[in-house]
């Protein structure tokens, strides 16, 4: 992986080429990971519904899983090799051993271990006793996945960690020069969380829908595998497809419950994920229900007109009740005076409430900082200052020219009068 040092435009081209290669490698790795997971699901379902007549097909499926796993490990090693080359290009290194840190080596080993977990075809089917003797009647499969084989099969779902990596490289953020330059100026790192926030802002509905459906289907199948040989009937896929959404939505009718420890753990994790997705959904809906900038300005303008009108009406009502109270007090009509005094106090209270609402609205409007408006104001102020400065410079230059002309006039006017003085002194 070492080589000559590449600088300037060649380094930029090399970086772009390495990122393109990383994108293709991450995409193919995700395809192989998905193929392996699909074959694993096919093997488990064939093992449950099939008999000894499907033993050869099951063995072939396991061999295909092993081949896809080997190819996936090769792609992961190639991807990290490209990452090391990219780091060398960015930092101007020649020795790859300097770029490969201990943490990165541990990450590579961990990824290889995680992606290498799969049910390997190490032994034949248990129902085949004599390979030379033909089977006269198909026997039912003696059991489902063993505990070790089930754990290895479910561990293949850990390969889904390749999805954020492929999405990051396919998003075009790392390949876009504008993103990189602006991000470098603002010290923003373009990692997986940035892409997640980007898609959450641009396509929140699609992202939440895909995430929710993916979690439902995955956890429903995992729960069916965990509960497949339990005493109750929770292991059927139809029951788990009902139990998982109910647990995900934190409803829990209680008509279907898990019977095994692994099933209870899956339901617990499903409830936690459901709470998190519900919080995301509430945040998205609340943001969608908010006014945008134009709607907020229109609403505030109309509310300002309404509060101003109410303030005028309240002030007029205060004056009216004050006059009525004064008139009935002068006439010694105590009953009517008390009635209008109560109305006067109520009108004063209403006027104060409306004025307080209007003041809060004004404070809210003033607290809304309009960036574009402030930019325009500052730009106009700068233009005015620049024009004033140029006008002042012109006036100073004009004044300097007039002073020079005045000096020349004075010198020409006083020069002939001062010349005869030496001759007169000589006489």
From Swiss-Prot:
Keyword terms of this UniProt record: Calmodulin-binding, Cell membrane, Cell projection, Disease variant, Hereditary hemolytic anemia, Immunity, Ion channel, Ion transport, Membrane, Phosphoprotein, Transmembrane, Transmembrane helix, Transport
PTM statement from Swiss-Prot or TrEMBL: Phosphorylation at His-358 by NDKB activates the intermediate conductance calcium-activated potassium channel activity, and conversely it's dephosphorylation by PHPT1 inhibits this activity.
A GO biological process held by the record: positive regulation of protein secretion
GO MF annotations in UniProt: calcium-activated potassium channel activity; calmodulin binding; intermediate conductance calcium-activated potassium channel activity; potassium channel activity; protein homodimerization activity; protein phosphatase binding; small conductance calcium-activated potassium channel activity
SUPFAM superfamilies: Small-conductance potassium channel, Voltage-gated potassium channels
Documented effect of changing residue 250 to S: Loss of sensitivity to triarylmethanes
Compartment(s): Cell membrane; Cell projection, Ruffle membrane
Phosphohistidine found at: 358
Distribution of this protein across tissues and organs: Widely expressed in non-excitable tissues.
Catalytic activity: K(+)(in) = K(+)(out)
Induction trigger: Up-regulated by phorbol myristate acetate (PMA) and phytohemagglutinin (PHA) in T-cells.
GO cellular component: cytosol; neuron projection; neuronal cell body; plasma membrane; ruffle membrane; vesicle; voltage-gated potassium channel complex
Transmembrane segments: 29-49, 59-79, 108-128, 143-163, 207-227, 265-285
Intramembrane region spans per record: 241-261
Regulation: The channel is inhibited by clotrimazole and charybdotoxin but is insensitive to apamin.
Region (Calmodulin-binding): 286-347
Domain-level remarks: Transmembrane helices S5 and S6 form the ion channel pore, which is surrounded bymembrane embedded helices S1 to S4. The S4-S5 linker, which contains two distinct helices, undergoes conformational changes upon calmodulin binding to open the channel pore.
Stated role: Intermediate conductance calcium-activated potassium channel that mediates the voltage-independent transmembrane transfer of potassium across the cell membrane through a constitutive interaction with calmodulin which binds the intracellular calcium allowing its opening. The current is characterized by a voltage-independent activation, an intracellular calcium concentration increase-dependent activation and a single-channel conductance of about 25 picosiemens.
Family under the similarity heading: Belongs to the potassium channel KCNN family. KCa3.1/KCNN4 subfamily.
UniProt-listed PANTHER family: SMALL CONDUCTANCE CALCIUM-ACTIVATED POTASSIUM CHANNEL
Disease affiliated with this protein: Dehydrated hereditary stomatocytosis 2: An autosomal dominant hemolytic anemia characterized by primary erythrocyte dehydration. Erythrocytes exhibit decreased total cation and potassium content that are not accompanied by a proportional net gain of sodium and water. Affected individuals typically manifest mild to moderate compensated hemolytic anemia, with an increased erythrocyte mean corpuscular hemoglobin concentration and a decreased osmotic fragility, both of which reflect cellular dehydration.
Subunit structure: Homodimer. Homotetramer. Heterotetramer of potassium channel proteins. Interacts with MTMR6; this interaction leads to selective dephosphorylation of PI(3)P in a lipid microdomain adjacent to KCNN4, resulting in a decrease of intermediate conductance calcium-activated potassium channel activity. Interacts (via the C-tail domain) with CALM1; the calmodulin binding is constitutive, does not require calcium and mediates calcium-dependent gating and four calmodulin molecules bind to one channel tetramer.
Descriptive protein name: Intermediate conductance calcium-activated potassium channel protein 4
Source organism of this protein record: Homo sapiens
